Amino acid sequence: MIGKIEIDEGKRGRIIDKAGHLADEVGAKYMSCAPATFGAICDAFRSEDIELFPPEIQEAITQGMIGLHGGVAMTGVGTCGAVAASTFLISYVVGVTTEELSKDDNLNYAASVPAVEYIIDRFEEDYGAIDCLRVRYNRVQRAFDLMDPDARILEMTFALYEKDKCGMNAPNFEGGRDQTPPVRGARWAAEAICDLLGMEPEERHELPPHLRGLGSQDMEPKLQKVVEALKELGWGRPNEKISYREYRTFKLKGKKGLEQKRLGSVSAPKGKE
């Protein structure tokens, strides 16, 4: 766990700007949002003598971050790599240990609240999404499944043809590069981390009043009577295990309908031998 570190306004501003510039430079070098965002944030703090990870640990984590690029494994369907990397670092600085979490699972909120406040809400406001495909489409009206080689070619063509719109390595930092998800994610995460480092470690674990008492350890004894009443009513069909594909059949035809063979399960007729 990282202890409290006083960061004055000058140093804070330099860290945030450095994180943004590095995210652009490294993002263009790697063409990979998650490792670029992660590395930019770590190196920005190191430039002001604040080490989040030793270099060898940072390198090891960066290798893992590569798989989170492009909406997880370059498919586009998962979370934006810049969001994932930023959230990872914020959670790390909040510093909830596994031992603490095993005693109070409500501490999941401690790592989540600042990530939502500084990263998720801002991505939703600026890009209308946090998943890779929609972030890219809403930003530049282009989005591809990068596992498709043709789509990869189209993406690179767009990046070279529309440099200012793409943003990577655009001449004007504020007008161009500052638009990109790695840059904004790195800047916003750096801002969050500066604020978190200004707190004592215990303060980072404090929750807003409306999220307190929601851990399973607190709720289970209070909810046990409710659970027993629901079981008596048969609510939720606790003994039924059906897939979402079977749910409509269940509603229309009941359990008997599920037990009947579907058309697709009938064996194909054998051909003449």
Where are these regions (language model features)?
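Acidic-glycine-rich active-site phosphate/pyrophosphate-binding loop
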Residues: 2-13, 41-67
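Phosphate-handling active-site elements
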Residues: 44-62, 92-115
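Long, low-complexity, intrinsically disordered segments
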Residues: 253-273
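Polybasic, low-complexity association/targeting segments
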Residues: 2-33
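Conserved phosphate/anionic-ligand binding catalytic regions in large, soluble enzymes, centered on
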Residues: 72-88, 228
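Short alpha-helical scaffolding segments that buttress acidic/His motifs in well-ordered protein cores
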Residues: 19, 23, 37, 61-69, ...
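Amphipathic alpha-helical interface segments
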Residues: 34-44, 86-90, 104-234, 245-250
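A short glycine/serine-rich beta->alpha loop
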Residues: 19-28, 68-78, 106, 172-179
